[in-house]
């Protein structure tokens, strides 16, 4: 199962659309916030792809949830933007507690614009980076 995980597109409609065009077999999109306007539009253009968004700190007026749990491919996935869990301070302790409390084996978050994947406490922690303003210099998802 291929799932698109992305975050922090900050208005980069063309980049976000390119991701969808390059992954036509994607079973779902998990969007982790800060780009509600373009992803709302893209969801209307590509309604056949299941879409599970959460809002970020820059998604003012958006009615998406701040966090959600998605069950896909036998995994229980906790999705959040990360700003409510202090991830910019390079600390994921609050995310770890939340994932344990919700019995999730995968944690997805954004906000830092820095792609990262870790495995600890029997869970994957993944930040896809940013489509528009990546800290590493190249867009990532």
Model-derived features: positions:
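N-terminal active-site segment of His-dependent metallophosphoesterases
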Residues: 1-49, 59-61, 65-66, 138-141
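Beta-strand-turn-beta hairpins that frame and shape the catalytic cleft
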Residues: 1-3, 69-78, 119-125
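Active-site neighborhood of phospho(di)ester-bond hydrolases with catalytic His/Asp-centered motifs
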Residues: 5-7, 28-34, 52-57, 79-81, ...
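Short active-site segment of divalent metal-dependent hydrolases/proteases
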Residues: 11, 37, 84, 114, ...
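Short, flexible, glycine/charge-rich loop motifs used to bind or transfer phosphoryl groups or to couple energy/partner
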Residues: 18-21, 40-44, 67-68, 95-98, ...
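Short glycine/proline-enriched coil/turn segments at helix->beta-strand junctions
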Residues: 24-28, 46-50, 75, 103-104, ...
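Conserved beta-sheet core of the metallophosphoesterase superfamily
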Residues: 52, 88-141
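Helix-adjacent hinge/juxtasegments
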Residues: 52-102
